[in-house]
């Protein structure tokens, strides 16, 4: 799933023509950057759950401790 160079050049022209403030990073023309495969996401605000986290959620009781504190997790 690669992008054609013509698409990238059009995107760079749009970005460079719209950047008028000095706070924005300059557009790097004809440079290939080594970007790692790891994507770091900010923490989710309290009270919001992502669908992938619903199955592995451990709910705390009113004392703030896990209901299974005394047991060893067999999957660990």
UniProtKB/Swiss-Prot annotation:
Top-level taxon of the source organism: Eukaryota
The protein's assembly and partners:
Interacts (via PxIxIT motif, when phosphorylated on Thr-44) with PPP3CA.
Q: Tell me what else is known.
A: May act as a prognostic marker of median survival time in pancreatic cancer patients.
Annotated region Required for interaction with PPP3CA: the residues are 36-41
Q: Which InterPro entries match?
A: DUF4597 (IPR027864)
Residue positions, PTM Phosphothreonine? 44, 46
| UniProt keyword annotations, A-Z | Phosphoprotein
Looking at the Swiss-Prot or TrEMBL record, what is one Pfam family this protein matches? DUF4597
- Residue ranges that the Swiss-Prot or TrEMBL entry lists as coiled coil: none
* Protein name, UniProt field: Uncharacterized protein C16orf74
List the lineage, top down: Eukaryota, Metazoa, Chordata, Craniata, Vertebrata
